[in-house]
Amino acid sequence: MKKRVLITGANGAVGKEAVKIISEKTDQYEIICLDHNHKRTQNRIGQYKDFVSFEYADITNINSLEPIVKNLDYVIHLAAIIPPLADEKPDLARKVNYEGTKNLIQLIEKNSPNAFLLYASSIAVYGDRLHTPDITVGDELSHSRGDAYAKTKIDTEKALRESNIKWSIFRLTGIMDPELNKPNPLMFHMPLETSFEICTTRDCGRAFVNALEHEKEIIGNTYNLAGGESCRAKFKDFLAAAFMVSGLGKVDFPEGAFGTANFHCGYYADGDDLESLIHFRKDSKEVYFEMMSKAIPEWQKFAAKLFAPLIKWGMLQTSEPWQAKKSNDKEGMKQFFNITI
């Protein structure tokens, strides 16, 4: 008999990769993709409609969720509000990430008590590790100043551990989607000297799908999920490579454009533990940049090269650290630079 798998956040960056991979295993699984946005879901993963079923519900509304969370064997829980939206709307982030997951837990306890849930947590739960970049699962959890997203992840992990369901937690490093190559203002929050370890979306999606076959080995445990040694670089070097691939040239922003404190990321010193169990790694950072280059049309690279100064000026205007420095904003200077004025 096929196992029933629910994937929440199925049209997200990791979700779409998980759907792509698991859709090749319909001999093993009956796959239910859950999201709240019908149009976006059809645009991103509608091509798999012959292999999966689609359900639409608001995870914060337990009544709309209940008919879907029945007779399940597995739940891959990826639905979340992530930065920068989580920073802009912290109340929404808490409602979706924490309260929504508690709804899911309650319904699993009631209607699918034997289901095994895989939860996507985040490296953000370790807080600022700029000067102590080697991270292990047993390290203290401490979200960075102003990081509402990390707080929701810490609290949700606690809720899972206190529940009566079967679970495993994967703390995701920086997950990179080569198809999402537009500038993200969040990059300015990260100190350039940050030790940065990535994982591609497809390796991450593969991890969640592979993990379904290893319930007994990983149940009740927490793991750090990242791409490994071949996916490591200082953020300044990673960004320099990304700019070259996209046609923007040098990362030549003025001093103060990037924060120097209160972010997150580092190297997962125990990241090989999960890889040794579920064998999900295939991509290196070089492979990521190759995929990124292929995803950007040549005309776009040419235009980026031609208008690079103007584009980078526009990017600078989105830098919160830069704006805080220019305006001598007390809260901003404390958050991004650890400077009290």
Set out the residue ranges of the language-model regions:
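Alpha-helical substrate-binding/gating segment
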Residues: 177-179, 186, 195-224, 228-230
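N-terminal Rossmann NAD(P)H-binding glycine-rich loop of SDR-like oxidoreductase domains
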Residues: 5-25
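Conserved Rossmann-fold NAD(P)-dependent oxidoreductase catalytic core, especially the SDR/UDP-sugar
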Residues: 81, 102-148
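NAD(P)H-binding glycine-rich loop region in Rossmannoid oxidoreductase-like domains
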Residues: 48, 52-99, 128
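Flexible, glycine-rich beta-alpha linker
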Residues: 125-126, 147-148, 168-189, 194
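Mid/C-terminal beta-alpha module of Rossmann-like enzyme folds, strongest
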Residues: 214-277, 283-291, 299, 303-307, ...
